[in-house]
Amino acid sequence: MSRRRRSNRPGNSQAKGPVRCNNSEECFGLVRQNRRRSKPTTHALLGESLRLQTEGAPAVHGVQQASSSLDVWSISMKSLAVIGGGITGVTTAYALARRGFTVTLLERHRYAAMETSFANGGQLSASNAETWTHPSTLVKGLKWMLRSDAPLLVNPRPSWHKISWFAEFIASIPRYEANTVETARLAIAAREHLFAWAEAEGIAFDHRREGILHIYRDRKGFEHAGRVSKLLAAGGLERRAVTPQEISAIEPTLAGSYYGGYYTESDSTGDIHRFTQDLAQACERLGVNCQYGQDVLSVRSNGSEARIELKGPEGVTEQSYDGVVVCAGVGSRALARQLGDRVNVYPVKGYSITVNLLDEASRRAAPTVSLLDDETKLVTSRLGEDRFRVAGTAEFNGVNRDIRADRIRPLVDWVQQCFPGVSTRQVVPWAGLRPMMPDMMPKVGRGRQANVFYNTGHGHLGWTLSAATADLLGELVAGAAAPSSVRLPVTAAAA
């Protein structure tokens, strides 16, 4: 097997500075512009998060750090490698390229968006910002332990990774309310970014802006939703309670009896796979070098240079960059360990089915409004006229991509019960691994080394949050690459 070494670091020519937009609606997350506004916006809050990080204050709004110790450093990064070609990696590459960096996107598959970003539920859902770190989650997990068709399934076989993750999950329960509020803020910011990028690049992704309807079959679930709505409102999201009669008016095709619901008109749905692939093409138009079929074997950094060993069509090669951004989903934990950091993402499997609506009767009987059934934890999206996506469940079973019939069957049964006029003759099953942090907050920020960054761990909200965290990461890297010295907290490496 051949081994080749290649440098992707530009020469000694003057560094190309990060691009700054004159119009704040063109380039979101710019701290100075947002501070000029008399009324704080969500983007200003994200910018304030970045300001707090540069001053060594505790991180907020999803930017995670493990230490408040400071390191004064000055760096002029020109070339950056982004590891991972899913929605998070591609949006990150796009945000960095817009700021003038020389970006290489490294993806082990032949195309972008072939794993977790392939066939998710499709919801761009600020209304789903509630984190899972609630005591009821543990109760349900124990109750459903022996049910193979349960919405939440935990393999009881122990592993240190699983035990440490759940220990940190339990430790995060006191921050449930605060993290839910901050996730709602991030989600609202993200959709503004994403819509603007889609319009700027002419991306068509079966986007449907008809809101998301949460349905509840009993009083207990509905009353809990009312408490969640107050947290979402604190994060800036408006949604309204609806009666069973209003549920029928919002989505007439839905069968069954329901206690009540909550409707979020500002939420929407779309095809994550199509969006990610088209944005990857937009990245290439901006000069991003998208290298597919490249499996990252190892990565290391000395603080000023990052070296990445790859296995691809040309054999084993080594490439060097000024910096690296890890957006590798469930693979981020292993890469972080090589870089001296701890990113405790756990793979939580979710399933989906795509129902092909082959006849006019099925197309009429399928819903157009996106749904979330609280009892079954299933979500839906109508993708164009001829596809109906149903997704959900959470399975803690390690790195396991098997598509199990006993996990797919409840999704098909749910369609037949709630939409009896939809033919399930042609159904495409799928399973993907969500990269989840124990506190349900994405890892966005610096690593131990000055030129190492992370944007990963978005869990079930990767599609929803990706554009905001990518833009925030772009701001952080741009600040690091500025000619003047800046003060940034160094993320302490955990044992």
Predicted regions and their residues:
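Active-site substrate-recognition segment that forms the wall
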Residues: 120-123, 128, 132-170, 298-305, ...
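C-terminal catalytic lobe of FAD-dependent flavoproteins
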Residues: 375, 417-495
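Glycine-rich FAD pyrophosphate-binding loop
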Residues: 98-118
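N-terminal Rossmann-like FAD-binding beta1-loop-alpha1 element of flavoenzymes
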Residues: 78-105
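Helical element adjacent to the flavin cofactor pocket in flavoenzyme catalytic cores
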Residues: 223, 227-235, 257-315
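Dinucleotide-binding Rossmann-like beta1-alpha1 core, especially the glycine-rich loop
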Residues: 119-243
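Short beta-strand to alpha-helix junction loop
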Residues: 178-188, 214-224, 249, 262-281, ...
